[in-house]
Amino acid sequence: MKKWLFPFAFVATLAGCSVSNESKQQANDTYQKSDAALPLFAPLNTAGVSLPKQDTTYQLPQVKVKKADQVDIRPPETPLAIIQNSIAQFDGERALIAYPIDKREVYNLQQVARLLKEQGIGYQLTNEKIVTDWAPTGRADEIGDTQVRYEIEQVSSGNYSALFVSILQMKRNEVVFSPHLADKQRYSSDRLNQLVGELDASYRKQVRDLNNSGLMPIQSVLGTDSNGRTALVLGAPFNHAWTKLGQVLPQLEFDIKDEIIGRGVRELKYRPAGAKSWWWPFGRAEGSSGLKTGTYFMQLSALGKQSAVVMTDDDGNALSGEQAQALYQALQNLLAK
């Protein structure tokens, strides 16, 4: 049987690498011993010799010093402006990040609720406000079992929307305590940065996936959607279809004016080029059966690994008849390339 002998120096090195969380939060210096009594010196034995009287100028005063509370030496946490064109700060009670309102579809309470559910954190969502159950902080430098109840709120005003995170309660090892200002800033900012960071990473990954998948051709057939409207059923998932449609619609003289990917909606402006426009072969020579100049909407719905696109006019009526046939056949041809 082989015996493994570890040098003492190696074992000592491993022991030296172990750092307790107490040392991460509290300084181990003379400040911790500030309540120690000052030294007293007994009078010198003069042996009959007359000595000059002691000068009290530099005598240390005997003052009773009361040691203050333990000081948390961890660096403060601050909200980070992770979102482009955003502003982040701590206002004394809440950590907040304000961002352009057009990003509200990505950074909102519904997305925050999804993250909390994935993390196994219980919550109640009412009136644009989330109140969580007790949740671990997720920090590696905690002493004991520290848990927090958070309040997360979304507010929109003008051209901006904002997410707020505040601390409702804190407890350590099942003992509830009142957080100091530094605690409120640290834990509210930490949770806000974590939530917004994950939402931002998820959004960027979705954009990359959309850009990468949009190059592949898509096969499609004419059918109906779940509401019985004439639709083009695409043999591709939502993300792939969304990107590909964004590439081919301008080729059919549709300008994309606005889009909300979270709802699968695009607002389009159609400006036909005349009798030689793409729809001319499907109508009469004068082109009277073609689409008219105006605003249209594209609605894309997910159907498992497939998706369906429906084109509607400005009043929300789905295109039908010769107009739908012409448009969807043109889309079929371009999507398959």
Curated annotation (Swiss-Prot):
Lipidation (N-palmitoyl cysteine): C17
Family indicated by similarity: Belongs to the BamC family.
Organism per entry: Pasteurella multocida (strain Pm70)
Residues anchoring lipid (S-diacylglycerol cysteine): C17
PROSITE patterns in the cross-refs: PROKAR_LIPOPROTEIN
Complex and partners: Part of the Bam complex.
HAMAP family for the chain: OM_assembly_BamC (MF_00924)
Keywords, alphabetical: Cell outer membrane, Lipoprotein, Membrane, Palmitate, Signal
Entry-linked Pfam families: Lipoprotein_18
Name of the featured protein: Outer membrane protein assembly factor BamC
InterPro entries: BamC, BamC_C, NlpB/DapX
Entry GO terms, CC: cell outer membrane
Subcellular localization(s) per the UniProt record: Cell outer membrane
Job of this protein: Part of the outer membrane protein assembly complex, which is involved in assembly and insertion of beta-barrel proteins into the outer membrane.
Entry keyword Protein transport: no
GO BP term, pick one: protein insertion into membrane
Topology relative to the membrane: Lipid-anchor
Region forming the signal peptide: 1-16
